[in-house]
From Swiss-Prot:
Similarity comment text for this entry: Belongs to the phosphopentomutase family.
EC number, UniProt record: 5.4.2.7
Binding site for Mn(2+) 1: D13, D339, H340
GO-annotated cellular components: cytosol
Protein name per the record: Phosphopentomutase
Organism this protein belongs to: Streptococcus pyogenes serotype M5 (strain Manfredo)
Residues given in the record as Mn(2+) 2 binding sites: D298, H303, H351
Recorded name of the encoding gene: deoB
Xref: Pfam families: Metalloenzyme
Amino acid sequence: MSKFNRIHLVVLDSVGIGAAPDADKFFNAGVADTDSDTLGHISETAGLSVPNMVKIGLGNISRPIPLKTVPTEDNPTGYVTKLEEVSLGKDTMTGHWEIMGLNITEPFDTFWNGFPEEILTKIEEFSGRKIIREANKPYSGTAVIDDFGPRQMETGELIVYTSADPVLQIAAHEDIIPVEELYKICEYARSITLERPALLGRIIARPYVGEPGNFTRTANRHDYAVSPFQDTVLNKLADAGVPTYAVGKINDIFNGSGITNDMGHNKSNSHGIDTLIKTLQLPEFTKGFSFTNLVDFDANFGHRRDSEGYRDCLHEFDNRLPEIIANMKEDDLLLITADHGNDPTYAGTDHTREYIPLLAYSASFTGNGLIPQGHFADISATVAENFGVDTAMIGESFLGHLK
């Protein structure tokens, strides 16, 4: 019998809590990640007021220097700790795959200086369209169409760009390059990026519409991912008949592997929280696992190095946390964590190699305190033990510490 009938895992994308022990091996604009501290630096530079996460125990997580504006709680309502990554990467897919039990020993490839000519030329030859070389670099998805959309409308060239994650994205105006044509080009791009030196996690079709100065991306986005190289705990759950619900980009991150119910993409964090709440309210969801990613922290504020915007985004989540809890049942377990860091005060624009926080809450708890410090995969091991399935490659369950 399961200790918790339902477990809900919410990933606050990029909300790290201090440099990891191996941060000296990871860099931003030539600067090692050793001084990165997403939550710490936001609390120092912008101020941070997250009373609902404080109640669970966020301020009690062990740190060399306490969070400046996040107090400790004498009698928290939950259990907390911080977790270390063992995989060789600090991207979204690596973090999520490890959280679900895998050890990624060969990281995906990222292209901070844009994609090599060999790849661009192959895409041009296949598509019969030229590629705008000036867009070939890490770029905001909205900024890239603002900057190059007018040119694409005139010439029909492709907008190919990347990000901090191991992705190749192709933006195309639907009136200039039909969606089905864009999909075929992306399928080809997927076929040539499945091994080194260009092993990419995802190819993303990014259709948009509108006129110069007023472009908007459409719902016709399509992701061409790769499946995890081995079964994750999601697969173990699905194979055992335990329903799994994906909210936000979780389904894309795992290429649908082990997901029995995809609840769709999020338009924003607020929309994602709405979708999570609707998922919690589903009458058929009496037992199982929900997995939510809220990406605005990372996409809108971490990469853009916007501390105040990041702070406000954390405030927004914290303000809505009581709504999530109000829609949980007494025998539900809520786990709040992250997948990597993205310190908005740091050099460069890339993710930062950090510990991630873990907050655990259930109305059924009679105790509280600290969970032993562990690793990302401890989350999946805990989920696995609760539902009576095998773990994946790595992870130690902390289920016994939750009382």
